[in-house]
Amino acid sequence: MSGTRCLRQLPVRSVPRATIQEALGQRRFQSSKGSTYGAAKKLFKAYPYSVSLASMFILFGAGGLVFVNYYYHAYIIGAFKQFPEPVAKELRKALYFTNQDLKPHQAIKFYKKTLRVAEEIGMDPFSDEVLGIKIQLAAFMEKIQKYHKAIQVLEIVRNDCLDWIEEFGDKPENVGKRTRILEKTVAISLKIGELYSGEYVKEPELAEEKLVWAVETTLRELQRRETEGVKPGEGKWLNREQIGASLEALGNNYEAQDQHYLASPLFLQAINMSPPKSCHTAVLMNNLSISVAQQTPPSIPGQAPVSRPTLVNNARAWAIKAIDVATNIAPPERTEECDLACAVATHNLGEFAEMDGDIAAARLKYDEAKSLSKVMGFTEGISNADAALKRLSKK
C-alpha cells in the first residue's frame, strides 16, 4: 500500500476548538485536529516491548476523550435556552467572565449566583438547564486548571442524580426523567474518570471506579430494555457509539496501568459498537493491536499461555485492518483520525517486523510512517520514526 492512499487529498488544517456554546448546537461527534493533535503529545506513548528496544505508538484515547468531552458538553449541558430572565441575566455575566474577559473569581461568583436565583424562583434542580449550569461550572474549573475542584463539583452533581434515581426513579410518572438523568450520570462519571486519570490528578484507581460504574450501568440498562422491553414514555437509551465510548474510556484506563489483558476485550467491544467505516474505528483497531502486542496474560491453571509470536501476529493483523479501514474512507467522512491511525499503525507494523528480525521490512515501514507524518505535519510521528531508523542503523 502506498503512503499517498493513506492520507486525505489535502493536508490537515487546525480547527479552532469550539466554545461550549458552539458545541451545544452540534448533534453528532466531530473530531477536530485541534483536539486530537493537541492530545497527541500526551496520548502517543512509547512502550518497551519484551527484550526489544523497540517502542510502539498507541492513540491513547484521543478520539475517545474527544467523544466523551463532546457528549459532556453537547448532551449533558444542552443548549442554554429557556432560562427565566433573572437566571439568564446572571448566567450571561458568568459566561462573560468565562469566555470574554477571563476573571475566575468573578465567573465563579456569578455561577453561584445563577444557581441561587434558579433555586429561589423554583427551577427544577434536575432540569437540563440547572444541571447544565453546575456542569458548566465544573468545566470552568477545568479550564482554569482547578482539576480537583472540577471533580468535586461533578461528584456532588453525580451523587445528587443517584439519590434522585434511587428515591424517585421507579415511579411510573418519572420513567422519562429517569432515563435522562441516568444518561447524564453515566456521562458525568466518564468525565470524572477522565479527570481522575489525567496527568494533573493521576488517581487511576478512582478513575477505574467511575469508569467501571459507567460501563456496568450502561450495559445493565441496555440489557434490561432488551429483556423487559422499553416502557411507555421511557425514551431512547444511549446509542452504540456512546456505549462504545464508555467501553473505550475504561480500556484506556487499563492501558495506562499496563493491564493490557483487561484493555483488549474492551477495545474489541468498542470496535463492535463503532461504525465499520469510521476513522475512529481505525483508531480503535490500532489501539487493540498495541494492547494485544503488549499482553502478558495471567496464567490460568490447565491452559497453555498464548505464545509471543501468536500475540504479535494477532497484533499485526489488527494494525493492517486499521490501515485498510482508514485508507478506504473518503471526505467528508474522513477526518484527521484516519491520518493518525494510518501513520501510527504503519509505524507499529515496523515495530512488529523489527521484533521478527526482518530489518528490511521494518525500515520500509518506518520510512513510510515518516513520510505520512511529514505530510500531516505530525512532528511526534516524524521524531519516533527517526529514532526507530537510527536504532536500525546500529543493527
Which residues fall in each region the model found?
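Single-pass hydrophobic alpha-helical transmembrane segments typical
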Residues: 36-79
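N-terminal topogenic membrane-targeting module
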Residues: 69-148, 153, 161
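Flexible helix-coil transition and linker loops at the boundaries of alpha-helical arrays
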Residues: 79-80, 118-128, 160-183, 200, ...
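Residue at a conserved register position within TPR or TPR-like alpha-solenoid repeats
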Residues: 97-98, 141, 189, 196, ...
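Residue-level detector of the short coil/turn that links helix A to helix B
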Residues: 102, 145, 200-202, 258, ...
